[in-house]
């Protein structure tokens, strides 16, 4: 389902559970691990765009990596890992019966999804015919300010496309936590774990 789980890929030492060694029948969906894979797709997309600007044979690679990124973005958006009440991304445990338990600990894990963002020339990302054919709705949505592709005016008046893993309102709410002295912001930088967890947290169940 393109959501990453199983530990190792993310910031395992910040979780109240051992993400690499879960109880039998329990699996985990990781906000940060999923974001790392989206960031990988974004990096490869940008490289493919550079190559395609010199040789159209690489257009297929542009399509491939944009498709991967959008699949991950859609999966994360539909997953429910973003808590609308708290305005934050949480990992989630799923047991053998399908019961879902969010790990409501605010750490850097929940901020990683907003880092999976890139900026490319809008004309360049729209140029390949295969891209226009397969992602016509996505590119049309960009013009109306919807979806993971958003148009912006870059330096020198150039039109660029910001391709982001999370929706703008999700990024804004997450950043509000970053700048809050009662959560992540400290006199010495950012905390790895929110100050709200001075009171110990226990995973339900």
Task: Write out the residue ranges for each language-model feature.
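Acidic, mature catalytic/reactive cores of soluble proteins
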Residues: 1-205
